[in-house]
C-alpha cells in the first residue's frame, strides 16, 4: 500500500521513523511544507488552507491513506481535510490519546501537554483527555522548540536555555508528558534529562509521542501486520528546499 505523510517540516520524521521501523506499508510519500514552517504560530483559517493545499499535492500520487503527522494541522485542519477527501486521513492526536488510555490507568495522574501555541489554544488535547476522565491536565505552549529543531539544534546551551525558560515556572511536576508536536520527540531525551536533573525526580516522566502511538493505532484500525512488507520505499517532497529535507532525513533517519 502506498501512503502519504504530511507535516509542516521535519517534525514528521518522528512519525516516519516509527512507520519505517514497523514496515506496515511498502511505499511512503513524505511531504514537508518547509516553506511555511512553523504552523504553530499561524491562525486556524490559514492552517486549514495549508491542509487543503497539502491534499491537492497528494492527489496525483494516488495514495490510499494520508497521515497528518503534525499536531497543529491535526488539531485545526484534520476535519476540514477529511471533508474534502475520498481516502482515509488519520491525525496524530487520537492515537496519542489511545496510548494514554492504555498506559495511564490513574485518572488523577498529573499530565502535561507540550505543543505549539496553535495546538494548545485549540484545546484539542485538553478536551480529549477530559472526555477520557483525566482530571489533572495542564498544558504549555513551547513553540520556540520548533525553529530550533528545524535548524538541527538538538542539544547545547541554546536548547538548555529554552527548556529552562519554559519549564522553570512549572508548579506541578508531571508524571506524564505528551509531546504534542511531532518535532518534540527529536529532543525527547533532552526533555526527560532536564526534568530528571532539575526537578530531582526518582523516576523519569512517561513520554507519549505520536510516532509510536500511530503505529499501534493503524495496526488496530486497519488490521495491518507489523513487518509485513520489505523496508518501505520513501519519496521526499517539500514546498521549500527538498534537497535540504532529504539531507535532514538521511541524518536523522539513517536512510
UniProtKB/Swiss-Prot annotation:
Residues annotated as the enzyme's active site: 70 (proton donor/acceptor), 181 (proton donor/acceptor)
SUPFAM superfamilies xref list: Aspartate/glutamate racemase
Superkingdom to which the source organism belongs: Bacteria
InterPro entries the record matches: Asp/Glu/hydantoin_racemase, Asp/Glu_race, Asp/Glu_racemase_AS_1, Asp/Glu_racemase_AS_2, Glu_race
UniProt GO molecular function: glutamate racemase activity
Pathway recorded for this protein: Cell wall biogenesis; peptidoglycan biosynthesis
Biological process according to GO: cell wall organization; peptidoglycan biosynthetic process; regulation of cell shape
Documented EC number(s): 5.1.1.3
Binding-site positions, substrate: 7-8, 39-40, 71-72, 182-183
Keywords associated with the record: Cell shape, Cell wall biogenesis/degradation, Isomerase, Peptidoglycan synthesis
Broadest EC class assigned to this enzyme: isomerase
Swiss-Prot/TrEMBL catalytic activity: L-glutamate = D-glutamate
Its job: Provides the (R)-glutamate required for cell wall biosynthesis.
Family affiliation: Belongs to the aspartate/glutamate racemases family.
HAMAP family: Glu_racemase
Designated name of the protein: Glutamate racemase
Native source species: Helicobacter pylori (strain G27)
